[in-house]
Amino acid sequence: MTDNTTPAATAETLPYKNPDLPAGERIADLLSRMTLEEKVGQMMQLDARGGDLEDLIVNKHVGSILHTSPEDLSRAAKTVNEKTRLGIPLIIGDDCIHGYSFWPGATIFPSQLGMAVSWDPDKVKAAGRATAEEVSCTGVHWTFSPVLC
């Protein structure tokens, strides 16, 4: 670890933030700057409901959060940009096994296994598309779906 400056101050000079460099070079540079604690944190995905979001991001160095409220999505991004040493973006995940059920006002569908027994692939596809559109509008990158249970 050789760099203790904030991401905003050095974005132009850090190789891992340079989109013109090959991905492998950027990754090697970023990994060389990370502490063991930061590397372990990047492998964790923690539930953001009711917890201290800043603690998860700044102290636990999480790489991913799930079950995040609309308000917390922008707060999480701001925390990463302003309070973390390397500014590694979060991956936002959520369970979307019957629609975007953690988002107030989203469309709720039967479980995927329940929809499968309808033998109507077009309706199942339409439900998946509707869920994908609702989820993508909220900043979620990763859904845990489909499932077989």
Locate each region found by the language model.
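N-terminal beta-rich core of secreted/periplasmic extracellular enzymes
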Residues: T2-C149
